[in-house]
UniProtKB/Swiss-Prot annotation:
Plays a role in virus cell tropism, and may be required for efficient virus replication in macrophages. It holds the Pfam family ASFV_360. One of its GO terms (biological process) is taxis. This is Protein MGF 360-21R. Transmembrane segments: none annotated. The lineage of its organism: Viruses, Varidnaviria, Bamfordvirae, Nucleocytoviricota, Pokkesviricetes. Coiled coil: none annotated. InterPro entries: ASFV_MGF360. It comes from African swine fever virus (isolate Pig/Kenya/KEN-50/1950). It comes from the Viruses. Belongs to the asfivirus MGF 360 family.
Length: 364
């Protein structure tokens, strides 16, 4: 058996994210460096955000969220440790539930209460942290929290409502509780970042939100989750409605293609693309064989969109991309590789650009 390490050496090893011998586990537990079934590890993610990892939180918690959980659990040693490692002790006021722990937070520098701006700052630190553990725990700690449900917190409510309006088509915001709005928000974040563990958590816990998951997948161009739910569930939404939803978002090539392969009317997708003035989606629809030029031209004229009028007026130059249409791929990974936004070039967009160059040459 190895010689027991000092606390200082163990902390350094944990901080450096090196392997910790199982022989040292009993020391880690005694020293308060053990949480939810494993050693605590401090690390940073690809966005250089500090995070805490443990056996139950393998993909990481944003450090302030870890502090909030430690405060809820009244785990005094971890509250002190996370604060020493850089967590904002004021975040702990979100979940404090005993006077003893509140006094500890005060002694570590916490304010008496958080104002509306500070509550919003807590949320903003958490919402873009891309891990399943973080999304799930954020939902569990915030969605029923009185500080976040307060009607006085008007700016926070506007942010949530604004996020939901971008993807809401099947419900009226005023008709659901703010608690459900928060649940839908965190669910949408899981789909946005394709966090499969978090998606499964919401899927199993909130069966009534299955259509919301589908709408989010279409809205965020998440062909992986679209494929998953389309094949797992009896989707109550028509495939043509699905392609109309995804065309309402810019550069949704993968989900447009998936819906097309599953039988959606590409002309309807073309019309929505023109209505939304999404040029790239329009060219992609033409690549997939869309031919609704006359109807789309009329819409473009009504909108006084001269660029789209010019594009649609060159209909005789365009033709379907047979190599794209013939593939009929439904594998999400292959679709994403084929239609990667940075690498994919529309055949018909290139034709349009060449015609512009030729016309410019004619002028000179």
């Amino acid at each position: 058996m190895s010689t027991p390490s000092s606390l200082q050496v163990l902390v350094k090893r944990v901080l450096d994210f090196q392997h910790v011998s199982e022989d040292d586990y009993c020391i880690l537990k005694c020293c308060g460096l053990w949480w939810h079934g494993g050693p605590i590890m401090l690390s940073t993610n690809e966005d250089n955000q500090m995070m805490i990892k443990s056996a139950s939180f393998k993909d990481g918690l944003e450090i302030n969220l870890a502090l909030m959980m430690a405060v809820q659990e009244n785990n005094c040693s971890l509250i002190e440790l996370f604060t020493e490692w850089g967590a904002d002790i004021n975040s702990g006021l979100v979940t404090v539930n005993t006077e003893y722990t509140r006094n500890l937070c005060r002694n570590l520098g916490a304010k008496e209460t958080l104002n509306k701006r500070e509550i919003l700052d807590v949320f903003l630190k958490l919402k873009n942290f891309k891990s399943s553990n973080n999304i799930i725990l954020s939902h569990e700690l915030l969605s029923n929290n009185p500080l976040f449900l307060s009607e006085d917190n008007d700016y926070f409510r506007r942010i949530i409502n604004c996020n939901l309006r971008r993807i809401s088509i099947n419900f009226i915001l005023d008709e659901i509780s703010f608690n459900e709005k928060l649940t839908r928000f965190w669910y949408s974040q899981a789909v946005l970042y394709n966090l499969t563990e978090a998606i499964q958590y919401f899927y199993q816990k909130y069966e009534h939100l299955n259509e919301w998951r589908l709408i989010c997948a279409l809205s965020f161009n998440n062909v992986f989750d679209l494929h998953e739910i389309y094949n797992k569930e009896k989707v109550g939404m028509d495939i043509n409605q699905m392609i109309e939803i995804t065309c309402a978002y810019m550069c949704s090539y993968s989900t447009i293609y998936y819906c097309f392969v599953m039988g959606a009317d590409i002309n309807r997708a073309m019309i929505i693309s023109v209505t939304k003035s999404y040029t790239y989606n329009l060219f992609f629809c033409i690549d997939l064989g869309a031919t609704a030029f006359e109807e789309c031209l009329e819409i473009a004229k009504q909108q006084n969109n001269n660029e789209l009028v010019k594009i649609l007026s060159l209909k005789n130059y365009y033709s379907p991309d047979s190599s794209l249409i013939s593939l009929k791929i439904t594998d999400p990974e292959k679709i994403n590789i084929l239609l990667d936004e940075e690498n994919y070039e529309s055949k018909n967009e290139l034709i349009y650009e060449e015609s512009n160059i030729n016309n410019s040459d004619d002028i000179f």
